[in-house]
Design a protein with these regions (language model features):
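Short, solvent-exposed loop/turn segments at secondary-structure junctions
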Residues: 35-38, 69-72, 135-136, 153-156
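Structural motif
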Residues: 30-32, 64, 129-131
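A nucleotide-sugar donor-handling region in carbohydrate enzymes
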Residues: 1-39
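Extended hydrophobic/aromatic segments used for targeting, binding, or gating
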Residues: 72-98, 149-151, 155-182
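Leloir-type glycosyltransferase catalytic cores
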Residues: 1-11, 159-211
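Catalytic donor nucleotide-activated moiety binding site of glycosyltransferases and closely related
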Residues: 33, 55-115
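A donor-sugar binding/catalytic signature common to diverse glycosyltransferases
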Residues: 118-161
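Well-ordered, non-membrane alpha-helical segments in soluble/globular domains
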Residues: 41-54, 82-95, 122, 198
């Protein structure tokens, strides 16, 4: 709670008025993007398909694209963190290109922003979709927002290590792990039909009574 309170009182974005445009959206969806390890293989085409379908039912939908979060103190690795943020931003731009009416949509890109700014933005979000593990810490664990978490079946065996409050997970039968020659749990990519994620998001929107 203290982190949330601090973020609410210390956000430069909020004090500048930059959040107001997004907060007028209904609903406001947080989309977590992974440009590095353990990613949803169809995240570009799949996320675009999900958003385009949601726009049919929710024309005032706003989207916050999240990605890499640099540590509170970057030290000598600031170049590395900028590079990782750019990877995520490249993925985000590919998704946005696939949204036909993007000129009239509300988007926010927060990949690379400090953790406190992300938490402040997360407090205004209605729901999220993101990787269940480290990719959703800010929105699911700290902001405690409802959402859909996706991960490989191999990672699902370790999901108890991650704190979630109201996150729906994808049925493991719909998840297909990508073979990793080194068999590293934390680096395994996975395939999921986008419709499985969309259906879970729709359930949450109905529960939230957002029309």
């Amino acid at each position: 709670t203290s982190l949330r309170e601090f973020a609410l009182s210390s956000s430069h974005l909020a004090s500048s008025g930059a959040l107001e445009f997004l907060e007028e959206s209904q609903p406001l969806l947080w989309v977590g993007i992974t440009g590095q390890k353990r990613c949803w293989l169809e995240q570009v085409e799949g996320t675009a398909a999900i958003l385009n379908k949601l726009y049919e039912h929710y024309p005032n939908l706003g989207v916050v694209f999240d990605g890499w979060t640099p540590p509170l103190v970057s030290g000598d690795r600031s170049d590395y963190h900028r590079k990782e943020s750019r990877k995520d931003n490249d993925v985000i731009q590919e998704i946005i290109k696939k949204l036909p009416s993007r000129k009239h949509r509300r988007f926010g890109i927060i990949a690379g922003l400090p953790m406190l700014e992300k938490i402040r933005i997360g407090m205004s979000v209605d729901l999220f979709v993101a990787n269940y593990t480290t990719g959703s810490i800010n929105i699911a664990r700290i902001c405690q927002k409802p959402g859909v978490g996706h991960m490989s079946n191999k990672m699902a065996y370790h999901k108890a290590q991650h704190i979630h409050y109201c996150t729906k997970v994808i049925d493991q039968e719909l998840v297909e792990d990508q073979s990793d020659p080194e068999n590293r749990v934390g680096y395994m990519d996975y395939s999921i039909p986008w419709q499985a994620i969309y259906n879970q998001l729709l359930e949450i929107l109905i529960e939230l009574k957002i029309e």
